[in-house]
Amino acid sequence: LMAENTDLAGSVIFEIGQSAYDGRSSTAVRNMRRLAELGFRFSLDKVRRLDMDFQELARSDVRFLKIGAQSLQDEIVESGEGPVFRALPDLAAEDFAALARRYGVDIIAEKIEDERQTVEVLELNIGYGQGHLFGEPRAIRGAILAETDPPADYLQAPLRRRAG
């Protein structure tokens, strides 16, 4: 089915949870590879562990890691060299996003609820964020249908008879 719809590859990103990704079967690995060969990309969601094999992520065509903004902050500890993540004590916390980018992976901080979290995410050099601060989730069906409605004055205009 996806082979027949490769024109969607630039618009579709498959999301998989970190634990599901870690527990993939060989069949799932092959299927991900096939989708990647068709141009589809992947995003790892529900990321809880930051000590990842970035080479493996790149080989699997994972292009995004979605990590909760609060989870990122909860993982930070102070070291003699400055802030680091517990799982990566040899890497400055502010260098984590750059490390991921070297492997073609962008970090998305999610569940950003207030401006304080935005500042904290920016201090980690993370370029993407999402959450209630940027707009609450909303039903899109009504909004999409409203965009396709004809203008109100068009609907209210009287019908004119043709002279003839």
Spans of features found by a protein language model:
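Short, charged low-complexity intrinsically disordered segments located at boundaries
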Residues: L1, V29-R30, G129, P150
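Bacterial c-di-GMP phosphodiesterase EAL domain
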Residues: L1-D7, R33, A98, G164
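Short, flexible segments with low predicted structural confidence
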Residues: D7, A28, L91-A93
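EAL-family c-di-GMP phosphodiesterase catalytic domain
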Residues: S11, E15-G23, F40-G164
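Active-site core of PLP-dependent enzymes with the aminotransferase class I/II
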Residues: G23-R34
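Mobile, glycine- and charge-enriched loop segments
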Residues: M32-L38, F42
